[in-house]
Amino acid sequence: MSTLRFKVVEEAYGRKAVPVAIPSERPSEYYGKYVFNRAQMYKYLDKDTYDALVYAIDNKEPLSRRLADRVAAGMKQWAMDNGARHYSHWFHPLTDGTAEKHDGFIEHDGKGGVVEEFSGKLLVQQEPDASSFPNGGIRNTFEARGYSAWDISSPAFIIDHTLCIPTIFISYTGESLDYKTPLLRALNSVDKAGAAVARYFDENVKHVISYLGWEQEYFLVDKALYAARPDLVMTGRTLMGHESAKNQQLEDHYFGSIPSRVEAFMLDLEIECHKLGIPAKTRHNEVAPNQFELAPVYEETNLANDHNLLLMSLMTEVADRHNFEVLLHEKPFAGVNGSGKHNNWSLGTDTGAMLFSPGKTPKDNLQFITFLANVMAAVQRHNGLLKASIASATNEHRLGANEAPPAIISMFLGAQITDVIDRLLDTDVDDDIAFSAKEGMKLKNVSQIPELLVDNTDRNRTSPFAFTGNRFEFRALGSSANCASAMIALNAAVADQLTKFKEAVDARIAAGEIKERAILEEAKKLFRENKAIHFDGNGYSDEWKEEAARRGLDCEASVPRIFDAYLKPESVEMFKRTGVFTDVELEARNEVKWEMYTKKLQIEARVLGDLAINHIIPVATRYQSLLLDNVMKIKSIFDGDDSGLAEQEKETIRKIAKHMYVIKDEVTKMVNARKDANKVENEREKAILYHDTVKPCMDVVRYHIDKLELMVDNEMWPLPKYRELLFIR
């Protein structure tokens, strides 16, 4: 293995940037080339079909079978003109990834040959095996039927010569088995509730749209180095490995010059994104070595989420062309920053108003204050649920460390917004809702630099849910996660709160109160009642943890127990009121969450035990034997005053023996703890046992392996080290 390590290190060092074929056209000319967008619909559908489809999309109405047949014919022709040979329903099962089954367009022609066919029935509905996906007990092998159905609001696309049709995925009995179905329900709920409140300010509002702009962080590792690390291959993270002498302490990687191999990968990925209609815009080095970020222009939430899932698949494919492996795990390396996926979330109306943007008039500002107060109330009431929506076995390694938001949900507003709220609560005058515009700041002694415009809020990187000027940044989501999980909880909670708010305001108006006064008083009431969630300080501090507990916020840090928030009465009732989940769906999803947590730790424990006993212990034993031989030879030559020359080697031998003893002992304990946990049938209790008994053993095993790495001869160490994984680019 040590020979393999040096071979792959040499191979990785010899890599050069792979040339990228840059299109001769501008990005705007090939953007969406492989997407059945409205421009392509207009080209391949007759006018009546096009108008009917666009109307159905804009008004969220189902397609008739006759219309579906006409759309399918045009879509098939477009797909085949662009090289597609197969089609697939593309959906998001409860695995955090995507699923697809490819079928050819061919059908018998009755003459011994085939013809290309694609009907509306095949476009609109398919029947995947529901029992083979995570389902929380809703489906069994003997009752396996499930349905996928076309989501017309997300355009079809072509990838690898396959027409992919975004779909929902439900069971034969109607329960959702995916992320898209409840996401669409939550978005419809916030649309309806938000529009009802927005019409207080503009009676022309018909819809409120949820927007999402994600920021995808990731690591790149050379393919050869990756293949020589079984833990990376099997679990997505390093289960052992001592920090390199240099990691991120010089702060020289963030926004640094992008390495040539990486820049070629980024360029290739960006071109592929644009062809698939993903508006990739920003790329840069992140904080940790070999860590990077890609961010797009924001989009409607459902489409943005589809694009993020598509991007993660694309990254793996493009990285392979550049001899990289993409690591989307939240914490692939200890001792350096992990990876997240900030979700920039906002609401806007179909008339063009952005509801989280402070306005220039009292009316606009009252609207802003109204929606701000409702978000604040929703986040406080459901802070435990929002934390559960981003919790996972992988994100557990990242949250709460001084690199990511704490495992306590709070809301940052900034000094100016806080000052306005404080003034509102101290006055009865409603025209006091005023926000200063961006102020000019001139740099001293640098006359050639133009005046800078300073935003009305600072940035608090320690806040998990921060207001950033015209949107909220939900920073706690993990890099490998499906954004839908967080967006479902957030949009549903806000929708439920807006509905309550409207009922309260309408009651005041019915009692004779002026509309503006009724709105303001209800908003002020929400600010008063939900102060506990507002925190602009250092979320990393121990003082905040104590203060958060005093405020009654959810401070649970154990992921299996965090999941309990989904089944609390206030969560269950909220999801039922908004029509997002039924009781059965919630219980099934939590079963899946606990089961996935257990399985991921189970795999990690098995891999760690194997590497410890079959890779590390043999190498440490061989090195220890070399030291023993050396000690015997020293003693055979030197005696008397020189007999102590072997003491350092003897001490090293003792330390190695101790580390090996603890490793073997803890691996045995870990195996037994796993066996005991596996006997438990209740998924929640099993997950808790893995967290409480298996995970601590893994931490001890890793600690002692990392100590051995510093002691064993570098020439003998079998696995690529952190300095090689993180600094060979």
Go through each PLM region and give its residues.
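N-terminal hydrophobic targeting/anchoring segments and the immediately downstream early-domain regions
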Residues: M1-S24, T141-F157
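Composition- and surface-driven signal marking solvent-exposed, interaction-prone regions
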Residues: N308, E330-K331, S357-T361, S485-V494, ...
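Glycine-rich, acidic/polar active-site loops that bind/position phosphate-bearing ligands
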Residues: E143-L328, N337-G340, L347-E591
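C-terminal amphipathic alpha-helical interaction region
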Residues: A523-R729
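Active-site-proximal loop/turn and secondary-structure-junction residues that shape catalytic pockets
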Residues: L67-V71, F91-P93, K121-L122, F169, ...
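Active-site proximal loops enriched in glycine and acidic residues that flank catalytic Cys/His/Asp
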Residues: L67, F91, S119, P296-Y298, ...
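Histidine/acidic residue-rich metal-binding segments in metalloenzymes
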Residues: A12-G120, V124-N140
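Short linear, low-complexity motifs centered on an aromatic residue
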Residues: D96-G112, S131, R229, G236-T238, ...
